[in-house]
A protein has these predicted regions:
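Structural signal for conserved beta-strand scaffold positions within catalytic alpha/beta enzyme cores
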Residues: 8, 56, 157-159, 211, ...
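Short, charged beta-turn/beta-strand-edge "cap" motif at the junction between a beta-strand
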Residues: 41-45, 91-96, 233
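Nucleotide-activated chemistry modules centered on ATP-dependent adenylation/adenylyltransferase
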Residues: 201, 221-222, 247-258
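Ferredoxin-reductase
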Residues: 2-83
Length: 258
């Protein structure tokens, strides 16, 4: 475990917060798609840590930026913490995204809070032109658009209600782009309905699709088996631990209905 001091903890969109922390010790190398496991405060400290996606890294300053959504008592307690408060954080954890050998172009597909870890993908490999396709519930729920725009070759947006970008689904934006652009890899994170639609869209195209799964976790290091997911293994299926074997998997090998 490591102590990290809060540098900033601010609301950046509807129910979305950005948390920047600086570690007391040297931050290990971070792979995009890895996560931080944060112990939450309280009169009686909450038993389970919360997994938060790593959004931005300043390695030279040992600083991580995490983005989280208000979902319950734990994240509400976290949102009340102020600059200078010390947190107990395990990071970086898990297996992140990887850039395939020879990849010259990429697409980034994110939905809601799932867009957060994809900023780290864009910033990790600036030499690879990447187009970003982001979907949100509404304009008020969108965040960090200027950061995504700076790091992307092109940024396309959609919302459920049409208040920002096009009204519709982010996978429709990707489908249209693929009529004119060839991508060597797709990086994705978002809600299950979005991932199912992405599976249908990409099946049979021969393009690798790496997905970061969002699951509640217990230990965060693979010991408790709380965060299992079903993954194709040859002609069979096996259960894998999202925290240790993932959170990044081959989307075409993940059973999203299980």
């Amino acid at each position: 475990m490591s102590r990290a001091v809060i540098l900033r903890n601010a609301q950046i969109a509807a129910d979305i917060y950005e948390l920047s922390v600086q570690f007391e010790g040297t931050l290990p190398p971070v792979q995009p798609g890895q996560f931080a496991h944060v112990k939450l405060p309280g009169p009686t400290p909450m038993l389970l840590r919360r997994p938060l996606g790593i959004n931005h890294v300043l390695a030279e300053l040992d600083v991580l930026t995490l983005v989280y959504q208000l979902r319950g008592q734990g994240t509400r307690a976290l949102s009340a913490l102020e600059k200078g408060y010390f947190l107990d954080i395990l990071a970086p954890l898990g297996r992140g995204f990887s850039l395939p050998d020879g990849a010259k172009t990429a697409a980034v597909v994110g939905g809601g809070i799932g867009a957060a870890p994809l900023r780290a993908v864009l910033e990790a490999w600036p030499q690879v032109p990447m187009d970003s396709f982001l979907g949100f519930r509404c304009g008020a729920a969108s965040y960090q658009l200027s950061s995504f725009a700076r790091a992307s070759r092109e940024l396309r947006l959609c919302t459920d209600d049409g208040s920002l970008g096009r009204q519709g689904y982010v996978t429709d934006l990707l489908a249209e782009a693929m009529e004119h652009n060839a991508y060597d890899v797709v990086f994705a994170c978002g809600p299950t309905p979005m991932l199912k639609a992405l599976q249908r869209l990409m099946r049979g195209r021969g393009i690798p699709v790496q997905v970061s799964l969002e699951e509640r976790m217990g230990c965060g290091i693979g010991g408790c088996l709380v965060c299992n997911c079903k993954v194709k293994y040859g002609e069979d299926w096996r259960y894998r631990r999202v925290c240790a074997d993932g959170p990044v998997f081959d989307l075409m090998e993940v059973e999203l209905d299980g």
